[in-house]
């Protein structure tokens, strides 16, 4: 039998050099590491990794080729109270594997035991890693590098975006290939999107609890192999990487960036009753935040929390991010529950992973977006991330909904959010683009559901409607559910228009949820993470062409307004913005705090947003000049000069002079 050579301790993972494969694995507490390779008949061959450099175990297998299936058995103490859960009976996934073969089914053999070890061997059913070779012709691909001030983000799910698209070939719907199809790219271009932000595409697993209920993890926030693409989105799992890169190359040619939603905060191993796939059996004590009793700190709500202050875990996370940029040419990341990235365990702007990203010549040049919270004490960190990061702005989301749907927000608070929440983000040299403004996201009501439902309806998730937030700031306009009278439909449409206008014409970086421009509904489900069905798939045949055109017109209007694209904080007297009352006069202090919800926002001295968020039709006197309403609030031809606007209840209009 071929013997392993010592090999090299870097880089991590399995790497083919044309003559064989070098294997490396980090484990600070292991006593022995076996490389397990499987032949075409499934026969297992074990080799002790002979190299041990610091905490890196390594070996070189001559004559090994791409396509080789492998895993690890890691020997060490079973001492749960100290955080050690080694179990060599369980085949483990290489954390840096580029491809996984097999399914993560709910099976007792894929668990290692809670208090007592389960020594039943699981190699027959355990997923296997696959050695890959990386040869790809990027041609003349170059990142679009869209300036932050010009960025329009579109948050979408790989499958849900195209699975029901009638103009995309059936055989590629719901896949990476569909993202790069000309029909999809033309749609994004016509809409005005500059960045496609994808929900997780790294390999993930469905939680055992969901599998037992006949459900699956649809969103993908349950990672198991951070360097491997999720194969279910590929036409052929063996070519997933090239399919993904083909899509990115096509999107780049159209000037569209690709941002990945990435989950570095926890793993699919869940809590101590969860499965054993990889990290827990390789070095539980190093990879996770461990309590004094040996259990996990659950700062994520998912059972475990990755210790991103441990040097080896920082190296792992940094290598993962570099891989997606260097190998797949992605243009940035949105970090799920990103406060975990800064935990030491308290949150720090100079936490090790933040410092590593800032000092990396690759990662410091891409777009970085934080979901700036986790669920632990001190986890709400909106506005506190390092200057390289933009952040989801939940202040904007709640303010926009409260202003237009709950009618309980003063003008001053609304204006503050409209002006990129400068009270939150104007610090440490950050620009207005640091505020990622959103009204909706994958997590929560869709825009249509915001105006059709007062309450969540998550019964299909199997938790008796207990899951999902109750703080929705929604308004069903008098009737719970879709449909209704013509008057009801029109009032809901007006609210949608008001929310979209506020989102797309405010200062900061707008993020649009895919389907909101169609009128997509999830029928009141505000936590559809486990609904891989028509509840979440965009039904293009039912898309509202009028709403899509309205959204596109707003986006293209935004690109014409210097005050929004120049990405500079607005200052008194700089000509970027003036705040006026219904009589075109500056607002008084009392009007800001207690006045009627009527406001005129003059941008770049040429564009005027007139707002009447009261219950009555109100006459709004426009500032001096020849004003005419512009698309999407009026047609292109024969503009009518207006000095006074008869503002409908809960209405708004945009004018130009």
From Swiss-Prot:
Coiled-coil spans in chain: none
Biased composition, class Basic and acidic residues, residue ranges: 458-467
CDD domains: AmyAc_Glg_debranch (cd11326), E_set_GDE_Isoamylase_N (cd02856)
List of catalytic residues: 336, 371
UniProt keyword terms in alphabetical order: Carbohydrate metabolism, Glycogen metabolism, Glycosidase, Hydrolase
Biological processes, Gene Ontology terms: glycogen catabolic process
Site (Transition state stabilizer): 443
Reactions that this protein is recorded to catalyse: Hydrolysis of (1->6)-alpha-D-glucosidic linkages to branches with degrees of polymerization of three or four glucose residues in limit dextrin
GO terms for MF: glycogen debranching enzyme activity; hydrolase activity, hydrolyzing O-glycosyl compounds
A Pfam family of this chain: Alpha-amylase
Purpose: Removes maltotriose and maltotetraose chains that are attached by 1,6-alpha-linkage to the limit dextrin main chain, generating a debranched limit dextrin.
Matches recorded under NCBIfam families: glgX_debranch, PRK03705.1
Name of the protein described by the UniProt record: Glycogen debranching enzyme
